[in-house]
C-alpha cells in the first residue's frame, strides 16, 4: 500500500481532501500548512514552517502531493516547500504538484482531484526555479524579485500572476498605497461599506493577497493614528485576536466605514500616505519602515529605492 502524503495551504482545502477520501480504503496523510507569508515578518511564528516535521513526512512518504491554490500566498508556500526539499536533497521524483485553477476548498467533495488538476512531477528544474523564487522573495530588497527570469516563473502556472500582484503591493510611487490599502479605499470611496463587505471584496479578488485575520488588522491600522484614512470603525482588533471576543467582533464587523478627507486625498493621488503617516510593515524579506521606503511604479515597471537621508 502506497504511503501518500497530501499537503495543503489551508484547513478548508484539507477539509475537501478529507471529505473526498472519507470512504476510501486507504487513507492518505493530509497535512494543512496555513502559513501567512505576505505582509508578515518571515521570521515570525505566523510564517514559520515546522521544517523538521514537514521534511520528515516528505522523506517517509512514498508519494507526496502539494495541493496548490492560485493565490499568491499559496504560490509562495509551494516555493518554500520545494526550496526546503531541494536543500535537504529529498527525492524530487516523489513530490507532485496539483495546480488548482480555483481554490481547492471550493471543490465539491465528490469531485476527484484528477478532474480538477492532474499531478505534475516536481523535477530538478521545478526545484531550482522554486529556490530562485523563494530566495528572491526573502531577500532584503525587492530587486531580486523584479529580476526573476520568466523561465523560472513559467514552471508554475499561477506564479507570474502572483509575481505581479506582489509587486503591486509595494507602496505606489504616487500615493504610497500598497494594493491592499488601495483596495480598501477604493471599495468605500463611493459610499460607506460594512467591514463584512470589505472582507468579501478581498476574498473575491482575482489574486487575493491576505486572508480575513490580516484584513481585520489592516482596517484597524488604516483607522488608527493621528492621520487615519478611514473612519467609522467600532473598536480595533489585531489579526491574532479578532476572534477572542464575539461581541467585539460583531461590533467591528457591523461598522460602517467611510473615507476621511485625508483618505480621499490619498486615493486621488494628491497626498502621499507614507510621507504623512509613515509605514511599518514587511514585504517578503524587505522591511518597509519610516517615511521613505521602496516603491513600485507600475507605469514604468520600475522600482524606486528609498531616498537617502540628507547629510
Each model region followed by its residue ranges:
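Acidic beta-strand-to-loop metal/phosphate-binding motif
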Residues: 7, 61-73
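A conserved mid-domain beta-alpha-beta active-site/ligand-binding segment of alpha/beta enzyme cores
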Residues: 113-193
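Charge-enriched amphipathic alpha-helical scaffolds
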Residues: 203-236, 240-241
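A broadly used, surface-exposed interaction patch
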Residues: 38-65, 86-88, 93
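Conserved beta-strand -> loop -> alpha-helix junction used to position metal-binding or nucleic-acid-contacting
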Residues: 29-37, 87-118
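Short acidic, hydrophobic short linear motifs in intrinsically disordered regions
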Residues: 191-203
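Accessory beta->alpha helical hairpin/"wing" motif in late/C-terminal subdomains of nucleic-acid enzymes
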Residues: 229-310
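A structured, charge-rich N-terminal accessory region that forms the first stable segment of a protein
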Residues: 1-47
Amino acid at each position: 500500500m502506497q504511503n501518500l502524503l497530501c499537503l495543503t495551504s489551508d484547513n478548508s482545502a484539507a477539509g475537501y481532501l478529507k471529505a473526498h477520501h472519507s470512504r476510501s480504503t486507504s487513507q492518505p496523510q493530509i497535512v494543512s500548512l496555513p502559513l501567512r507569508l505576505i505582509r508578515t515578518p518571515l521570521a515570525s511564528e505566523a510564517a514559520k514552517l515546522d521544517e523538521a516535521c514537514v521534511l520528515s513526512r516528505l522523506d517517509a512518504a512514498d508519494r507526496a502531493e502539494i495541493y496548490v491554490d492560485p493565490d499568491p500566498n499559496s504560490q509562495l508556500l509551494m516555493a518554500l516547500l520545494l526550496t526546503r526539499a531541494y536543500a535537504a536533497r529529498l527525492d524530487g521524483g516523489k513530490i507532485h504538484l496539483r495546480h488548482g485553477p480555483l481554490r481547492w476548498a471550493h471543490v465539491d467533495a465528490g469531485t476527484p482531484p484528477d478532474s480538477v488538476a492532474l499531478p505534475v512531477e516536481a523535477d530538478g528544474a521545478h526545484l531550482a526555479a522554486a529556490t530562485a523564487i523563494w530566495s528572491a522573495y526573502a531577500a532584503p530588497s525587492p530587486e531580486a524579485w523584479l529580476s526573476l527570469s520568466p523561465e523560472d516563473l513559467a514552471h508554475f502556472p499561477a506564479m507570474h500572476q502572483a509575481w505581479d500582484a506582489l509587486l503591486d503591493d509595494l507602496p505606489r510611487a504616487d500615493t504610497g498605497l500598497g494594493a491592499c490599502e488601495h483596495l480598501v479605499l477604493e471599495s468605500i470611496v463611493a459610499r460607506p461599506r460594512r467591514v463584512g463587505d470589505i472582507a468579501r471584496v478581498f476574498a473575491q479578488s482575482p489574486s487575493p493577497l491576505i486572508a480575513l485575520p490580516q484584513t481585520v488588522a489592516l482596517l484597524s491600522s488604516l483607522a488608527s493614528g493621528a492621520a487615519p484614512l478611514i473612519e467609522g470603525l467600532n473598536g480595533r482588533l489585531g489579526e491574532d485576536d479578532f476572534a477572542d471576543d464575539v461581541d467585539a467582533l460583531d461590533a467591528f464587523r457591523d461598522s460602517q466605514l467611510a473615507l476621511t478627507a485625508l483618505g480621499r486625498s490619498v486615493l486621488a493621488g494628491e497626498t502621499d500616505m507614507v510621507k504623512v503617516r509613515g509605514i511599518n510593515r514587511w514585504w517578503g524579506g524587505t522591511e518597509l519602515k519610516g517615511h521613505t521606503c521602496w516603491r513600485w511604479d507600475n507605469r514604468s515597471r520600475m522600482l524606486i529605492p528609498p531616498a537617502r537621508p540628507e547629510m
